[in-house]
């Protein structure tokens, strides 16, 4: 069996983490070895970078600094966790990956997509997700859910225009490559979202066999 790299993407409050756990349980019930991870993070070093990226601070972080920190964490994550798991034939379920960089640093911060692509090639080589699930919902619903969780991180404190750009970028990327992306209506009740994931399970198992 070959490894399979599945990423879960979407804006704040989309339920990626909850649904990642659900999807992992469904795959494990079929006897599949699953590794759960997240970005930024996934290793001790990358988690420390995550803290820098998410912690509110009196010192403004430049968009370029943010971008480079994201890819520094990703390089460590790939070397230490993702590539070895794929080599072992496992299914990797990752909460965010490079699509988030295009959405947040590209769309939200307004950085050049070409600049991001150069770093993507440098850090990842030819590694891309086999499948990306984009959990989509209206910005106001996502921000309301994020606020209900408690203290907001540095990204969650951004304004409506930032998240409009994030959502728009995700949708543009999904439309441009329908073979890799699946849109999930994350505004639905959780049971309905998970029912839609159930319909994807045969596709995931077929991808793994392929």
Curated annotation (Swiss-Prot):
InterPro entries listed in its UniProt record: P-loop_NTPase (IPR027417), Thymidylate_kin-like_dom (IPR039430), Thymidylate_kinase (IPR018094)
Keyword Membrane on entry: no
CDD domains given in the database record: TMPK
Residues that hold ATP according to the record: 10-17
Catalytic activity entry: dTMP + ATP = dTDP + ADP
GO terms of biological process kind: dTDP biosynthetic process; dTTP biosynthetic process; dUDP biosynthetic process
Keyword ATP-binding: yes
Function: Phosphorylation of dTMP to form dTDP in both de novo and salvage pathways of dTTP synthesis.
Family: Belongs to the thymidylate kinase family.
Protein name in UniProt: Thymidylate kinase
